[in-house]
């Protein structure tokens, strides 16, 4: 959308429409038909406040910039980013602010293919503060049952890494619902949707998960 979000336009967007806007934006991105925007005009329009329609929890990977892959403008999206797109108390608090206080209608946990953090967790990497961070991703590795051979459960196995990535997204969705009464209540009432997605760094496409 080329117009800048305001309070009224945000209020008119349903959770389903918010998801549709992201899907449409990704299709434009893939087709090379991004909408033209006067970014400085959007800066001016958002001086007094912001009314994003979604919050994206994504990885820090430089290949996955939410505003670009969803063809969104300034003021459209909240972004929370951490390597491996896992959920912790700070992320939950940010999501609660975005939805309960700032009116966002959609929560997206966005994983991506060839994720370095997921690969590190698959390989059991130990390095400084990275060790504790990757420990947050190990449950997704452990919950991925196939293959069972240890030699095949490494970053060298592309299908295994992809399955762990999807599993990690789904576990993050469960964490959100289980650990945030505010977000769970908003979703149950129909005020928001909470969905998972996977971005393909080779094609530019976003697959929303069931």
Residue ranges: model-predicted function:
Residues 1-49, 75, 84-105, 116-210:
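Divalent-metal-activated hydrolytic enzyme cores
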Residues 57-94:
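Active-site cofactor/substrate anionic-group-binding motifs, chiefly glycine-
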Residues 61-63, 113-117:
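Gly/Ser/Thr-rich loops at beta-strand to alpha-helix junctions
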Residues 57-59, 81, 108-112, 195-200:
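Short beta-strand segments
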Residues 21-23, 54-58:
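Short, hydrophobic/glycine-enriched beta-strand segments
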Residues 53-55, 104-107:
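Short active-site oxyanion
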């Amino acid at each position: 959308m080329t117009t800048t979000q305001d309070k009224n336009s945000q209020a008119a967007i349903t959770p389903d429409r918010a998801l549709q806007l992201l899907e449409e934006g990704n299709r434009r991105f893939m087709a090379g038909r991004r909408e033209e925007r006067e970014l400085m005009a959007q800066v001016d329009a958002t001086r007094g406040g912001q009314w994003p329609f979604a919050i994206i929890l994504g990885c820090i990977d430089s290949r996955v910039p939410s505003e670009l892959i969803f063809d969104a403008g300034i003021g459209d999206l909240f972004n929370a980013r951490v390597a491996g797109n896992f959920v912790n108390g700070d992320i939950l608090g940010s999501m609660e602010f975005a939805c309960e206080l700032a009116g966002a209608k959609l929560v997206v946990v966005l994983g991506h293919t060839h994720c370095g953090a997921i690969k590190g967790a698959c390989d059991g990497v130990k390095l400084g503060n990275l060790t504790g961070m990757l420990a947050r991703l190990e449950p997704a590795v452990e919950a991925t049952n196939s293959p069972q051979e240890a030699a095949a459960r490494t970053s060298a196995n592309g299908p295994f890494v992809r399955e762990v990535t999807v599993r990690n997204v789904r576990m993050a969705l469960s964490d959100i619902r289980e650990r945030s009464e505010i977000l769970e209540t908003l979703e149950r009432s129909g005020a928001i949707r909470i969905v998972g997605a996977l971005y393909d760094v080779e094609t530019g496409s976003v697959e929303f998960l069931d």
